[in-house]
């Protein structure tokens, strides 16, 4: 495992992982907001 961190800078790897997870979370939330069932902002009142 230590050889992997000699190839890649751990700071850049962590920034990349967190950036990817943030983009993925935004995409999932916008997909849910585009549906009628899971739109918690402007959905139909039940």
Swiss-Prot record:
GO terms for cellular component: organelle inner membrane; plasma membrane; plasma membrane light-harvesting complex. Pfam families: LHC. Keywords: Antenna complex, Bacteriochlorophyll, Cell inner membrane, Cell membrane, Chlorophyll, Chromophore, Light-harvesting polypeptide, Magnesium, Membrane, Metal-binding, Transmembrane, Transmembrane helix. The core complex is formed by different alpha and beta chains, binding bacteriochlorophyll molecules, and arranged most probably in tetrameric structures disposed around the reaction center. The non-pigmented gamma chains may constitute additional components. A bacteriochlorophyll binds at residue 29. InterPro entries: Antenna_a/b (IPR000066), Antenna_alpha (IPR018332), Antenna_alpha_CS (IPR002361), Light-harvesting_complex (IPR035889). It is a single-pass type II membrane protein. Antenna complexes are light-harvesting systems, which transfer the excitation energy to the reaction centers. The chain crosses the membrane at residues 13-33. Residues 34-46 are periplasmic. It is found in: Cell inner membrane. Residues 1-12 are cytoplasmic. Belongs to the antenna complex alpha subunit family. It comes from the Bacteria. Its main location: membrane. This is Light-harvesting protein B800/850/890 alpha-1 chain. One of its GO terms (biological process) is photosynthesis, light reaction. GO terms for molecular function: bacteriochlorophyll binding; electron transporter, transferring electrons within the cyclic electron transport pathway of photosynthesis activity; metal ion binding.
